[in-house]
From Swiss-Prot:
Biased composition range(s): Acidic residues: 247-280
Biological process annotations from GO: DNA replication initiation; mitotic DNA replication checkpoint signaling
GO CC terms: nuclear origin of replication recognition complex
Source organism: Debaryomyces hansenii (strain ATCC 36239 / CBS 767 / BCRC 21394 / JCM 1990 / NBRC 0083 / IGC 2968)
SUPFAM superfamilies the record matches: BAH domain, P-loop containing nucleoside triphosphate hydrolases
Main location as per UniProt: nucleus
Keywords recorded for this protein, A-Z: ATP-binding, DNA replication, DNA-binding, Magnesium, Metal-binding, Nucleotide-binding, Nucleus
Protein name per UniProt: Origin recognition complex subunit 1
Localization per record: Nucleus
Region feature Disordered, mapped onto this chain: 21-52, 219-317, 334-370
Polar residues composition bias: residue spans: 21-30
Residues bound to ATP: G423, T424, P425, G426, V427, G428, K429, T430, A431, E509, N542, R615
Length: 810
């Protein structure tokens, strides 16, 4: 990359264009291109090559380079394109390789050559589809990359060629986690020479997960040979079309500049599409925008409308529609099939394949600096993030085994069943179920288990509980229908004895799917009891006895006795979870940044005393690392300490953990909750207690009022007299809050039985909490209105437990 011609100092660039090299046959001078040739010439045909004046190193498209960015270890890349840019004078686009040393051993393909770390070839590279820009000053030299056959037959690695000769036989994604099958790298180079856009697209389709590439799954099975044949067949057609259009332009003598034919308007993408998808636009070698005015544009359009686009799913869709009609039509129902659009490929922005290097703006490293300590801090924060993929789930072995055995048995026996999983938030319920599904998938791929389908429904993501019917039917048939029709179709589908694979449905956040009639949950728990359904339902909720408290007997009985409870993590388990993530660090970063065991124990005990939520413990540790990193950077600014700091390890101590905990304690929401009066805290305590008893996120205002009074009565019986001793030895909190006021309570004629149903100013208290975003209320002031928390339950619990008067209620 060169931002201006000034940045090209020490380099020369050449335009490899056959037309520019043409000379007049008579006088040897360059000829001026005719208007016809200039119009027919595409700027994309000009290739740029570079030459370094110092050592005459020449660089062109397809060369393999050794690049060193920001004082990091050199990496290998292939030059995809050298072109004149919009923001920069010259852009050098490369596709990165990942070295073997940057791949975690657990992520390598499970094949014989990668079985032991000692047998791995350190000179093996993995090609990726990740594109990036490099600067001219970052280019070190060229390297050689060979195929497996060339490397094994002709090359002996020694000190002379160890840093410049490599082997490539697989590709992978930018994270180094998904790998392609073995290929011949020389065939891949031939594909690059023919079309470098198809080269990148081929690697991308082989390494992008199927979930992000659902509409192109058929390309997964294509080999390099197939892709080469496809490119060969495409080339003549494109040239013919371009030539025909160009000839038509010449015949009209450029008199039709303001017109475009119907064919070209349909085939050529708009300018907005060209800007949004560079790879797609460059792969289509279109001729210039001038077009011949079509004499019969309408006829051409009508002809194009009759062209039938092949659809691989048409037969499957027809069968699904026929089944829908047979089920819905006899009941005189109006069938409505929703518009279903295929999932588009997500606009992923993969991180750079070089692990441990994070690029920021302008090609520089992020704000953490470029030294090893900053990279260690960055990796440590990544491993402590709650979304980090783990190779195993520590401290959940028993629960994992129970779920695994239940699902494996149901799949093998081709029967339906219900499994109820409960536990407080953050104890690993959903993660454990997903890990079980992943393990079962591996058994299926090895042929040791029957194949099955899997669907995940999250109650928080549904607009209404009935949408669950639509999700399930869409998974089965591929068509979207209305909820009412989907319920009928599902009932008929599970009643019929037709060949089908077992279907596992994970219903997360079950308490959000509860309705007044309970018909949604009844159907989902009833269908597995059908003899031919092969439906396996895993219900996940936050309360163990939710079926008994909320559901009717006919629903709770269908859940059976297959119940698995996840209890909150103890401080020892939280410490094990944090240490497990720290073990995932590289050896170099382990030595550079260390979290003291005392600090881990301090964070674990603090979280275990409140909720046992692993996510909260990881968040606190991650924030402590950020605070420690800030201290490290501030100490690094002192010039005298820079060399000493580089050679030492940095420790995350208890003080950093304490600061992170204090930040959560002293957050604006926590400070607001601490400033609330006793009556407002009593309302919040009533909400928490009611949620614990009912197992539901939403509870009626009347139930919360009753919970408040019952809890206050129990508190009064223990130590309520001591709270108001300074005012009156006979006065209790119920007299104060549910009476007609303090002055009336001090009156000798006041009867303690004459109390109100609600505490004084109750409506004002609830409105204050709603307006400040603590509670949500759908109908104000009504006893049957539903109340739910608008902030984290843990944040309220941590504040109320520090209040001496209210903590005894909880």
């Amino acid at each position: 990359m060169a931002k201006s011609q000034r940045d090209l100092k020490g380099w020369q660039y050449f335009l490899d264009d056959a037309e520019l090299n043409n000379t007049d046959s008579v006088n040897g001078e360059p000829t001026t291109p005719s208007r016809r040739s200039r119009r027919g010439k595409s700027t994309s045909s000009q290739k740029i090559s570079l030459k370094r004046e110092e050592d005459e190193l020449e660089i062109k498209e397809g060369d393999f380079l050794l690049v060193q960015q920001d004082n990091n270890s050199p990496e290998v890349a292939i030059v995809k394109e050298i072109k004149f840019g919009n923001d920069n004078f010259l852009d050098i686009i490369v596709s990165w390789f990942i070295r073997m040393r940057d791949i975690e051993e657990a992520d390598l393909p499970k094949v014989e050559e990668y079985k032991e770390r000692s047998q791995l070839n350190e000179n093996e590279l993995f090609i990726t589809s990740y594109l990036d820009e490099v600067k001219l000053g970052e280019i070190i030299d060229k390297v050689n990359i060979l195929s497996e056959e060339e490397f094994n037959n002709d090359i002996v690695i020694d000190d002379s060629n160890k840093a410049s000769t490599f082997i490539c036989r697989r590709g992978c994604d930018s994270a180094g986690e998904l790998f392609t099958d073995v290929f011949d790298f020389r065939d891949l180079c031939v594909l690059f020479e023919k079309n470098h856009h198809e080269f990148i697209e081929f690697i991308r389709r082989k390494t992008v997960p199927v979930a992000y590439n659902a509409n192109k799954t058929h390309d997964k099975s294509k080999s390099i040979k197939d892709k080469l044949d496809e490119v060969e067949t495409k080339k003549p057609k494109q040239k013919t079309v371009s030539k025909q259009i160009l000839d038509e332009e010449e015949e009209n003598n450029d008199s039709s500049d303001e017109f475009e034919s119907a064919i070209d308007l349909q085939d050529e993408p708009s300018s907005d599409e060209l800007e949004s998808d560079e790879d797609a636009s460059e792969s289509k070698n279109k001729s210039p925008r001038k077009r011949k005015a079509s004499s019969k544009p309408k006829a051409v359009k009508e002809k194009q409308k009759r062209v039938k686009i092949p659809n691989n799913h048409s037969k499957f869709d027809d069968e699904s529609r026929q089944f829908i009609t047979s089920v819905v039509s006899p009941l005189n129902k109006r069938m409505k099939i929703k518009d279903s659009s295929k999932p588009s490929i997500l606009a992923l922005s993969p991180r750079k394949p070089k692990k441990g290097v994070s690029k920021g703006e302008n090609g520089k490293n992020g704000s953490l600096g470029v030294d090893a300590s900053s990279e260690a801090f960055k990796e440590l924060k990544e491993k402590l993030h709650t979304s980090t993929r783990l190779s195993s789930l520590p401290c959940r072995e028993d629960e994992f085994t129970s779920i695994y055995l239940n699902l494996e048995t149901a799949i093998q026996e081709q029967t339906g069943c219900c499994l109820y999983v409960s536990g407080t938030p953050g104890v690993g319920k959903t993660a454990t179920v997903r890990e079980v599904i992943a393990q079962l998938r591996e058994l299926t791929e090895m042929g040791e288990l029957n194949d099955f389908d899997y669907l995940e429904i999250n109650g928080l993501k549904l607009l209404s509980p009935n949408v669950a019917y639509e999700k399930l039917w869409e998974k089965i048939s591929g068509l979207k229908v209305t909820a009412s029709n989907a319920a009928l179709l599902l009932e008929s589908y599970f009643s019929q004895d037709t060949p089908r694979k077992p279907l596992i449905v994970l219903m997360d956040e079950l308490d959000q799917i509860v309705t007044k009639k309970q018909n949604v949950m009844y159907n989902f728990f009833n269908w597995p009891t059908y003899s031919n359904s092969k439906l396996i339902v895993i219900a996940v909720a936050n309360t163990m006895d939710l079926p008994e408290r909320v559901l009717s007997n006919k629903i709770s009985s269908r859940l059976g006795l297959r119940r698995i409870q996840f209890i909150g993590y103890t401080f020892e388990q939280l410490g094990s979870i944090i240490k497990h993530r720290l073990d995932m660090l590289t050896k170099q970063n382990k030595r550079k940044v260390i979290i003291n065991s005392d600090a881990i124990g301090f964070a674990s005990r603090k979280v275990a005393s409140v909720s046992g939520d692993a996510r909260r413990a990881l968040t606190i540790c991650r924030r402590a690392v950020e605070i420690a990193e800030k201290d490290f950077l501030s100490s690094k600014e002192d010039p005298g300490n820079e060399q000493e700091i580089e050679n030492e390890s940095y420790h995350v101590q208890i003080s950093h953990i304490s600061k992170a905990i204090n930040e959560t304690v002293n957050s604006p929401i926590s400070q607001f909750l601490m400033s609330l009066p006793f009556a407002s805290k009593l309302v919040l305590a009533g909400v928490l207690l009611r949620m614990k008893r009912s197992g539901l996120a939403e509870n009626s205002l009347g139930d919360i009022i009753d919970e408040m009074k019952n809890s206050l009565t129990m508190l009064t019986s223990r130590d309520g007299d001591k709270v108001l001793e300074a005012i009156d030895s006979k006065m209790t909190l119920i007299d104060l809050l549910y009476g007609n006021g303090l002055l009336q309570n001090l009156d000798s004629t006041f009867n303690s039985k004459d109390t109100n149903i609600r505490i004084l100013r109750f409506k004002y208290i609830v409105n204050e909490l709603v307006e400040n975003g603590i509670l949500q209320q759908n109908v104000r002031g009504e006893r049957h209105s539903l109340i739910n928390l608008n902030i984290s339950e843990e944040e309220i619990v941590s504040v109320l437990k520090r209040d001496k008067e209210i903590s005894s209620i909880l």
